[in-house]
Amino acid sequence: MITAYHGSPVAFDRFELNTAGDGTGIKFGYGIYLTESEASAVHYSQPRKCALTPDHYLYTVEIPDLTPDNHLVSAQPVAQAIVQATEQKLGQPVPEAVVAHGKEFRKWLGCTLTGAKKAGFDEEKAAAEFLDAIGVIANVWPQAQSKPDGLKNFAIFNPARVKILKCEHIEIEEVKGKWIRIR
């Protein structure tokens, strides 16, 4: 299992997808956004472009281990097992051009499922639901783009795959444009 973190101005006892996209949007796909960086989760406990909210929560969670066949990486090739499962379920081939990058594959899949020309919220949601149904649990990308092999961020498709281990009510302050935890 992987330990990850989530920051929120709201206390809750389980994750739900009905608010997916409310915090930071769906830039990295539809799902529950988690990170291996506690500092990053603390930062995102404060909604963007809003006055300081009175409450901030840091969730420590557990998610399944990543295997080559159970996740997409935004800037890496899609595992052949995922491509094959997608082709089998869709009943059509996946274009070679989209297999080179998880992000392009995800967007192509969403558009294929909805018939849209451009990927938006509905397409990202459709792709996430499809991928979850074939055993793919997440989109994954580097927490810092300059360190592709460093800490990871995750968009988990199914809330049942996220186990909350701890929820802490925290205090934060802004330092040089970042929200940090007051210890």
Regions of interest found by a model, annotated:
Residues 1-183:
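Active-site and NAD+-binding cores of ADP-ribose-processing enzymes
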